[in-house]
Amino acid sequence: MTKVGLRIDVDTFRGTREGVPRLLEILSKHNIQASIFFSVGPDNMGRHLWRLVKPRFLWKMLRSNAASLYGWDILLAGTAWPGKEIGHANADIIREAAKHHEVGLHAWDHHAWQAHSGNWDRQTMVDDIARGLRTLEEIIGQPVTCSAAAGWRADQQVIEAKEAFHLRYNSDCRGAMPFRPLLESGKPGTAQIPVTLPTWDEVIGRDVKAEDFNGWLLNRILRDKGMPVYTIHAEVEGCAYQHNFVDLLKRAAQEGVTFCPLSELLSGTLPLGQVVRGNIAGREGWLGCQQIAGSR
């Protein structure tokens, strides 16, 4: 039996309103629990369009057929008009998710975090995280115990900023296994549970065809000797590609693969490491990457 942590990122208003209810229904039918990370502030994701001037981002948008993948409402959100606030407008959906799944903070403003957090000072970052956590806690009526940085934009500054909130774990980076990042003080910080597997948009049209993706991914999972963590998006697997996701769950069950919330991957003793800026194939710009203590 292979256990895989299932992380669901919810980036947008449409992903929350349309994608999450579909995913909740799918997961219920398959008796699966996951970790769902919500963006709760304004939906300004359309402001990423300026990144089309960057060749790597343009190529990613073209090979993943972004217009049909996400829809024009997502691609233009927050451009010609102020972005709609996601959280309170979809409070019933978020509360329903929290009844059955582990719920955490993705971001207050996903676009702002992904585009600007790398240049924020620590207090700005702390204030932004606090705003998101406060809003999510108001909605679900209980403390939030986990978070996942938008776009995996995380480094030492993010690690230090999140320590103020005493969360059970964060999932801010890409890597191979759960670990504890070393703080500036030299002490171990809050546990990190990295995403270990590629997302749909990182590999489609580059490493694999859409129709071959599920078999390709299951091969990766079955060959993984560590603790696999897979991320889906409410805007993708909950919308245009929900049938592909259902097929993945059916095929995974046949192969003895089970999915679980990320917290089930935590153990008593974790290795030490750091979160450093790096790059991965298929994703434009820097992101947080796991570095085991003592390695370079």
From Swiss-Prot:
* Enzyme Commission number: 3.5.1.n3
Q: Which SUPFAM superfamilies match?
A: Glycoside hydrolase/deacetylase
Indicate the family of this protein: Belongs to the polysaccharide deacetylase family. ArnD deformylase subfamily.
HAMAP family (UniProt xref): ArnD
Q: What class of enzyme is it?
A: hydrolase
Q: What is this protein called?
A: Probable 4-deoxy-4-formamido-L-arabinose-phosphoundecaprenol deformylase ArnD
User: Matching PROSITE patterns, A to Z?
Assistant: NODB
A cellular component term, taken from the record's GO annotations: membrane
Pathway membership: Glycolipid biosynthesis; 4-amino-4-deoxy-alpha-L-arabinose undecaprenyl phosphate biosynthesis; 4-amino-4-deoxy-alpha-L-arabinose undecaprenyl phosphate from UDP-4-deoxy-4-formamido-beta-L-arabinose and undecaprenyl phosphate: step 2/2; Bacterial outer membrane biogenesis; lipopolysaccharide biosynthesis
Q: Which GO terms describe its molecular function?
A: hydrolase activity, acting on carbon-nitrogen (but not peptide) bonds, in linear amides
Q: Does the keyword Lipid biosynthesis apply?
A: yes
List the InterPro entries. Answer: ArnD, Glyco_hydro/deAcase_b/a-brl, NODB_dom, Polysacc_deacetylase_ArnD
